[in-house]
From Swiss-Prot:
Protein name: Small ribosomal subunit protein uS9
Organism whose genome encodes this protein: Pseudomonas fluorescens (strain SBW25)
Keyword Cytoplasm belongs to the record: no
GO biological process, alphabetically ordered: translation
Domain of life: Bacteria
Family as reported in the entry's similarity comment: Belongs to the universal ribosomal protein uS9 family.
Any one GO MF annotation of this record: RNA binding
Length: 130
C-alpha cells in the first residue's frame, strides 16, 4: 500500500464498507461504479458526502469504496462511517468537528430478532378476553 492513501472501515446495520482516500479531484467510486450510479436515492448520496462537506475536502480526494451486506441506507451509513475514519487518519484535527456532527460514533442499532410465539420482534398476537 502506498503512503499517500488513507484507509477506514465503516459499519452500519449489516453493511461493511472499506474506504480508501487518495489525493485527487473528488471522484467517488463504490464497487467500481460512480456514486450517482450506485445510489439511486439522493438522500443516500447526501449521507455519503456529509463528512467531506463538513471538513471541506470534497474536491481534495478520490474515494474508492468496496461495500458488502445490508441495504441502501445501511450501506450509505457504512460508507459515511468509513470516510470519517479515513479522514481522521489523514488529519487528526478533523476529529472534533466530525465528533460534534455525530459521524465518528458507530450507530449500534441492529434489527431485533423475532421471538417464538410473537408475530414480529415485539408484536404479539391479538388478545381475546372471551
Amino acid at each position: 500500500m502506498s503512503a499517500t492513501q488513507n484507509y477506514g472501515t465503516g459499519r452500519r446495520k449489516t453493511a461493511t464498507a472499506r474506504v480508501f482516500l487518495r489525493p485527487g479531484t473528488g471522484n467517488i467510486s463504490i464497487n467500481n461504479r460512480t456514486l450517482d450510479n450506485f445510489f439511486g436515492r439522493e438522500t443516500a448520496r447526501m449521507v455519503v458526502r456529509q463528512p467531506l462537506e463538513l471538513t471541506e475536502t470534497v474536491e481534495k480526494f478520490d474515494i474508492y469504496v468496496t461495500v458488502i451486506g445490508g441495504g441502501v441506507s445501511g450501506q450509505a451509513g457504512a460508507i459515511r462511517h468509513g470516510i470519517t475514519r479515513a479522514l481522521m487518519q489523514y488529519d487528526e484535527t478533523l476529529r472534533g468537528a466530525l465528533r460534534k456532527a455525530g459521524f465518528v460514533t458507530r450507530d449500534a442499532r441492529e434489527v431485533e430478532r423475532k421471538k417464538v410465539g410473537l408475530r414480529k420482534a415485539r408484536k404479539r398476537p391479538q388478545y381475546s378476553k372471551r
